[in-house]
Amino acid sequence: MMGFIWFWLVAVMIVGYVVLDGFDLGVGVLHLFLVRTEAERRATLASIGPVWDGNEVWLLAGGGTLYFAFPLLYASAFSGFYLPLMIVLWLLILRGVSLELRNHIDVGVWRALLDGVFGLSSALLTIFFGAALANVLRGVPLQADGYFFLPLWTNWQPGPHPGILDWYTVIGGLLALVALTLHGALWLSIKTSGELAQRARGIVNPLWLLLAALTVVSLVATIAVRPASLNNYFSLPVTFVVPVGVIASLAGIWLLNRKAQPVKAFLSSCFYLFFMLAGACWGLYPTLLPATTGTDRDITLSRAISGPHTLAVGLVWWGFGMALAIGYVVFVYSKFRGKVDLHAGGH
């Protein structure tokens, strides 16, 4: 029972990160091509200024929860994914530095460079995060000792000895890029006004078409690469409500954006991300990290979980910490409600 609880607690942390940090990553991608004037750039950055660093805390908290509850998985994944983790770490550093330094430099060339770094690092982060999830769904070449190493790519095929990037994980990366860019566009349509908000709302429709197509492609590809991902759904048919939720939330984004209801459309986007991630987690359970070298080497709940006393004590502290985190999120977002000032560059 504790394994089931902690599996879904880790999933909650991942969903929280993707939903909250996802829109400011999407805003970063849009910063590359949607904004046209310096005032619009300031407004775009102001729309995420008070929340972007707090949103990233969910990533750290998720990693800490993973280490606490499933130490074997943490050790195996963080050693095997060492190369992409270092790339992600540097991208996070570059993104944060470019975002903060821009406000302290008044030289056009340097600002343009920092804008490019901010946008490019945001785009690459979304791609790597999507590819990371696809790597977990596809599986990795676990050895008998529970460890593995992945090169950046091999022959681009998701076989027994794949690389980090193959055609399947690239689809996952593109899906994440489009989904979070759309998520960011809806956020901008809420937080900004005038032509910038209109352009943000206008780009949602073409992004939605791409997202709908990539969603179908990714679901078909996942079934082709790992047919076992359907087992839990057929053993408990009521869970087919999850893919139904994906379809309903996608439809909600389209309809609510056309009705000029950006807040409700943004919430639909949140639900889309929730259902997609929940569906991926349910397709894995109780496996935490599948092995392409044989199911006997899968890292499962029973193999990776901490001791029962540790988990019971941790559950109390996790609840306390989550209450503080949720309280902080509610406070910050309630203080940050409303639109940013396009010309003042602030809220």
What kind of region is each of these model predictions?
Residues 1-54, 60-63:
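N-terminal signal-anchor module of multipass membrane proteins
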Residues 138-148, 274-296:
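Juxtamembrane non-transmembrane "cap" segments at the membrane-aqueous interface
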Residues 27-50, 67-77, 100-111, 184-203, ...:
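Juxtamembrane membrane-water interface segments of multi-pass membrane proteins
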Residues 291-312:
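Short, membrane-exposed interhelical loops at transmembrane-helix boundaries
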Residues 6-17, 78-92, 119-124, 163-179, ...:
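Alpha-helical transmembrane segments
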Residues 51-125, 143, 229-237:
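Membrane-interface helix-loop-helix modules in multi-pass inner-membrane proteins
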Residues 1-10, 67-82, 137-144, 158-167, ...:
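Helix-coil boundary and interhelical linker segments in multi-pass alpha-helical membrane proteins
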Residues 101-265, 279:
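Long, contiguous internal "core" modules enriched in hydrophobic/ aromatic residues
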